[in-house]
Regions:
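Acidic anion/phosphate-binding donor-loop and adjacent secondary structure
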Residues: 182-203
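Short alpha-helical donor nucleotide-sugar binding micro-motif in glycosyltransferases
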Residues: 85, 270-271, 277-283
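Membrane-proximal helix-turn-helix segments that form the acceptor-binding/catalytic region
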Residues: 109, 137-155
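Carbohydrate-associated surface elements
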Residues: 41, 162, 182
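Nucleotide-activated donor-binding/catalytic signature segment of Leloir-type glycosyltransferases, i.e.
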Residues: 247-271
Length: 391
């Protein structure tokens, strides 16, 4: 079976979508499928390149912002896309942008079947410019994605039930199957097997959050929660990540320190996976504030070593599915509610210890090997339908 993955930049770092695509392709190859990638060039000149390579495309005025988000776009070069589609038995669409629209159009013309994965909400795009609440922009974008990409697919993979329900409300024509993007089991075990925790900072309590410094991750809500927490003086906040809002977050943190709201300056840093594993083993709580999140597996990666999370709950974020109690959820963008939940868990250390044990190994439920079996089943089902229709 020859499968073509279509993604703007398969090799982008600090981009959850590209990372998910790389894991999926690797596992599909291990399962014996012939998988090739249609993508832009690898930003690492010494790294591997896609089998079908597209030129880089820079968006006027917005290119700097796009790249700060760990993202990049490729040119929809018809000749290369046609060559790639002709090679494949089935085309797997990973995004709903220009190269995917072109691939869908060409695949339909050549009679090649399409499947897709829904990785992004329109709000993910517009949150960067403060338009995540705009019904006009988000509604138009969703209709365009649906008409030009997803309705041309026979099956669309929905990483969560939350996503499936949204697509059903928009009357997507494709069959919708809920399949997690999945986590690599070996990586999960490695995280739990670390013997030496690495404590950084000087707080009585260490609270960590992991993710891009971007608007939709809503990290300012965690900082603002310190205004309402009775434990603020004893809390060391650790922000693991990077992104376009780094200066704004640092400034807000400095203001809180200067006003005496918090005594211990928050730590901002980008850490290797090995460092994240060691830091995570020495924290008391994990906070996930994102109000737009298709799945949020970075949260599960962290908490499955045995950390109690407090996760934002909202209309367009699915991550609160990982919370095992109501005290591990807070209303999105509500810093007071978050502070109350933080104080609750810090006030009840024994209960927190018992609760943390419940999360150990929870990531097994999201083992990517299970996801790969279901994705391969999609391919087989779709190809069988096409063969039957051709008779």
């Amino acid at each position: 079976m020859k499968v073509l993955f279509v993604v703007n930049n398969f090799y982008a770092k600090g981009n959850g979508l590209s990372g998910s695509a790389r894991r999926t392709v690797r596992k599909l190859k291990e399962a014996g499928l012939d998988v090739r990638v249609l993508s832009g060039a690898n930003p690492d000149p010494n790294g591997p390149e896609p089998e079908f390579q597209l030129q880089d495309y820079r968006i006027p005025f917005f290119d700097r912002l796009v790249r700060k988000q760990g993202y990049s776009f490729s040119k929809a070069e018809t000749d290369i896309i046609t060559e790639a589609v002709k090679w494949a038995d089935i085309i797997h669409i990973e995004e709903p942008f220009a190269i995917q629209m072109a691939a869908c159009r060409i695949a339909k013309k050549l009679g090649k079947p399409l499947v897709g994965t829904y990785h992004l909400h329109p709000e993910n795009l517009f949150a960067s410019v403060g338009l995540e609440k705009s019904r006009i922009f988000n509604g138009f974008t969703m209709r365009m994605w649906q008409h030009m990409v997803f309705d041309k697919c026979e099956v669309v993979q929905c990483p969560t039930e939350n996503v499936k329900e949204r697509l059903e409300r928009h009357h997507f024509k494709a069959e919708l199957r809920v399949i997690s993007n999945g986590l690599v089991r070996e990586d999960l075990l490695t995280r739990r097997d670390k013997e030496s925790a690495m404590k950084i900072g000087h707080g009585k309590y260490n609270i960590i959050t992991i993710g891009r410094y971007s608007n939709e991750k809503d990290l300012k809500t965690l900082l603002n929660a310190m205004k309402y927490s009775k434990h603020a003086d004893d809390i060391q906040l650790i922000f693991c990540g990077r992104g376009p809002q780094k200066k704004k977050l640092r400034h807000l943190a400095a203001v809180l320190v200067s006003k005496g709201i918090i005594k211990i300056p928050p730590i901002f840093g980008f850490y290797s996976l090995d460092e994240l594993q060691k830091i995570s083993l020495a924290v008391d709580l994990y906070i996930h504030c994102a109000f737009i999140e298709v799945e949020g597996l970075s949260c599960m990666e962290a908490i499955q070593i045995g950390i109690v999370p407090i996760i934002a709950e909202g209309k367009h974020t699915a991550t609160s599915q990982f919370a095992l109690s109501e005290m591990s959820k807070f209303k999105e963008r509500d810093s007071k509610d978050l502070a109350e939940k933080i104080d609750y868990w810090l006030d009840h250390p024994q209960e927190r210890k018992v609760e943390a044990k419940k999360y150990v190994g929870m990531g097994e439920k999201y083992n990517i090997d299970n996801s790969i079996k279901q994705i391969i089943q999609i391919y087989e089902d779709v190809l069988a339908r096409h063969e039957k229709a051709a008779k």
